[in-house]
Amino acid sequence: MNRRNISAFNQQATGKADTLYMDNKEFERALAQVVLGQPTAFKSDSAMVLLESQFKFQSEKHKQANLAWLEQNKKLKGIKTLPSGLQYRVLTEGTGPVATDSSEVEVHYEGSLLDGTEFDSSNTRQQPDTFRQNKIIKGWREALTMMPEGAGWNLSIPSYLGYGERGSGQQIPGNSTLIFKVECLKVKNNPAKK
């Protein structure tokens, strides 16, 4: 049976120092009751400890799965891995200037999660976006200072170079690796020569 180990919960709920185990159905029933504001077999403080513990467990599990994916991805032909952990594959060579920290960059891009869920796309909007180089996530900032105008790259951005443990809104969970297909259309304001 698939069981969930909720450490420290039993201490809060019953005063006993051992660990409580709940199967999936029990956990889902208790979670639904808490969300709906219905009475549960747990004290409200204990229910919060249960939820926090479960979310931390799931977040760590998600983080480890994403790190394992990056380890496998870097072995693929054509993937380059930088010391920071950023991974990229050149799709189209560019010949123009590259961005500096004070540049603005006009790009077309598609962003997705490892499961293929697309969370943003300038291509869908049929309108390129312009970003200030110093106002974007670290993974993009690093890539765009190496990516010449006219280039197209696939980026695999570890969570610590993206949105970290917190994620971003409802679409990007914490500890998510971000996959981007980026086309650098124009480097504006203080470009560096390649």
Residue ranges and their predicted role:
Residues 1-194:
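Cross-family detector of peptidyl-prolyl cis-trans isomerase
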